[in-house]
A protein has these predicted regions:
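Short acidic-glycine-tyrosine-enriched beta hairpin
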Residues: 122-136
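Bacterial N-terminal signal peptides
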Residues: 10-20
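Glycine- and acidic-residue-biased ligand/ion/polar-headgroup-sensing regions
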Residues: 103-105, 110-115
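Bacterial N-terminal signal peptides that target proteins for export
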Residues: 1-11
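Ligand-binding loop in jelly-roll beta-barrel domains
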Residues: 80, 116, 136-162
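Conserved short histidine dyad/triad with adjacent acidic residue
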Residues: 71, 86-101
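A short, N-terminal "cap"/entry segment at the start of jelly-roll beta-barrel domains
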Residues: 25-82, 167-204
Length: 204
């Protein structure tokens, strides 16, 4: 079902290229900061290629947004020092819990399906081809309000949150292990993110 996640590859590539330029200019200001020209490897991946991971089982009454996701671009995947990108598919009715990223900007590309998105003080429905820009420190939540799976591509302006995602998951093929709310908080700290708690999940 991950084939839907590449329906707007051209848009994703253009956005990623713009973010690379911005991120690189900031990196140049930091002494000793690694350069993507020195470390990043060119990469071409099909829809189902990448680091497929299965989310761990929550020990409370909550459930993750999706059972699996694919990390495609990150320092560990191809040496990228400026961008992180991946894909996931949300089932009908599934939600993205309210959270924010303390360091990274994020872009969400809706490749298929229909989402209702809460972003800061804004709220609206978005459809296939829609885009959400999430500045750092902005609260975001969403829900698949359609009758079909919703495919997403996520792009971060700097590495970090992929470590939260890895902490909350296991490699595909391994048995998912339980994860407590306290462990989820520890995982969030790894990627410089913060959750508002499941009680704040949106209703639609």
């Amino acid at each position: 079902m991950y084939s839907r996640t590449v329906s707007t590859v051209g848009t994703a590539v253009a956005i990623m290229a713009a973010l690379v330029g911005t991120a690189a200019s900031h990196a140049d200001q930091s002494a000793g900061a690694p350069s993507s020209d020195d470390t990043a490897r060119p990469l071409m991946l099909d829809s189902e290629e990448g680091e497929l991971r299965t989310r761990r089982i929550h020990t409370d009454s909550s459930s993750p947004a999706s059972s699996q996701f694919i990390l495609k671009v990150s320092p560990k995947n191809n040496g990228s020092q400026h961008l992180v990108a991946g894909t996931e598919v949300l089932a009908p009715g599934a939600t993205l819990p309210k959270h924010r990223h303390l360091v990274q900007d994020e872009i969400l590309l809706i490749q298929s399906g229909t989402a209702h998105v809460w972003l800061g003080d804004q709220e609206r429905d978005l459809h296939a081809g829609g885009l959400v820009f999430i500045p750092a420190n902005t609260w975001i939540s969403g829900k698949n309000i359609g009758a079909t799976p919703m495919a997403l591509t996520f792009i971060f302006s700097a590495p970090g949150f992929e470590e939260t995602m890895r902490c909350n998951s296991v490699p595909a093929g391994e048995t998912p292990t339980p994860i407590t709310p306290e462990q989820q908080k520890d995982c969030a700290h790894l990627g410089h993110s913060e959750s508002a708690g499941r009680q704040d999940n949106p209703k639609k």
